[in-house]
């Protein structure tokens, strides 16, 4: 009743200052005394929890070539056995402080920085919700991949492409002039192995089901064209071990 709702409530919490986190912290390593940090700590998942890592993401840092390459290394033969799939982002600003705020620039940046791993999927740009919260698309993609996996008894048989996400527009940076693009224009990204978000069917959805290795018209290993194909291959080989 109303009486139970009367009064005040206080709460305390700690918040991480992620501005102090460097690429080297995400990459991490293992010390001679057996301390694990960053991506290297993935090796602790199986011996401590008997769980197999199948997705690796680092939103906010995966746009760094050093971190992306470390993720690609970390996803292979974890504990000498398991393989995982990387979900990463392209930057909105490059290492020289130049904006990556158009489709043409995003495609050029991806190629120049070799964000083309077949064990990965990359996203651009970002997205914002009705409260002004900005999301890396890799964050939203991992949520939808996990949701789809759960609906299929943890079998990664469904892509996150065309899944609804809680945003209202694309985001290219606080000072960007870009007003966004539609599904048809977004195909320029997906044809170059870049997944994105578009307005479709009366809602905003993730768009693109290719791996980062895909380029339309290029000679691409058929198994590495679609994200779901690579994830299913990993699931099968992981299950056999």
Task: Enumerate the language-model features and the residues they cover.
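Surface-exposed interaction regions enriched in Ser/Thr/Asp/Glu
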Residues: 1-25
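A glycine- and small-residue-enriched flexible loop/hinge signal that marks low-structured segments
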Residues: 21-240
């Amino acid at each position: 009743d109303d009486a139970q709702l009367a009064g005040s409530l206080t709460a305390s919490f700690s918040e991480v200052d992620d501005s102090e986190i460097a690429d080297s912290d995400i990459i991490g390593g293992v010390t001679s005394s057996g301390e694990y940090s960053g991506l290297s700590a993935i090796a602790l998942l199986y011996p401590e929890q008997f769980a197999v890592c199948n997705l690796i993401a680092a939103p906010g840092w995966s746009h760094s070539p050093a971190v992306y390459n470390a993720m690609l290394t970390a996803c292979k033969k974890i504990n000498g056995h398991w393989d995982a799939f990387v979900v990463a982002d392209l930057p909105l600003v490059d290492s020289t402080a130049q904006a990556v705020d158009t489709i043409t620039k995003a495609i050029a940046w991806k190629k120049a920085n070799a964000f083309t791993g077949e064990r990965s999927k990359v996203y651009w740009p970002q997205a914002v919700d009705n409260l002004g919260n900005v999301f890396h698309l890799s964050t939203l993609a991992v949520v939808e991949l996990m949701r789809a996996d759960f609906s299929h008894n943890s079998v990664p048989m469904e892509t996150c492409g065309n899944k609804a996400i809680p945003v209202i527009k694309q985001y290219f940076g606080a000072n960007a002039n870009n007003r966004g693009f539609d599904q048809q224009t977004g195909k320029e990204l997906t044809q170059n192995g870049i997944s994105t978000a578009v307005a479709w069917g009366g809602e905003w959805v993730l768009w693109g089901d290719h791996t980062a290795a895909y380029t339309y018209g290029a000679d691409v290993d058929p198994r590495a064209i679609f994200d779901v194909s690579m994830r299913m291959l990993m699931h099968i080989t992981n299950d056999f071990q």
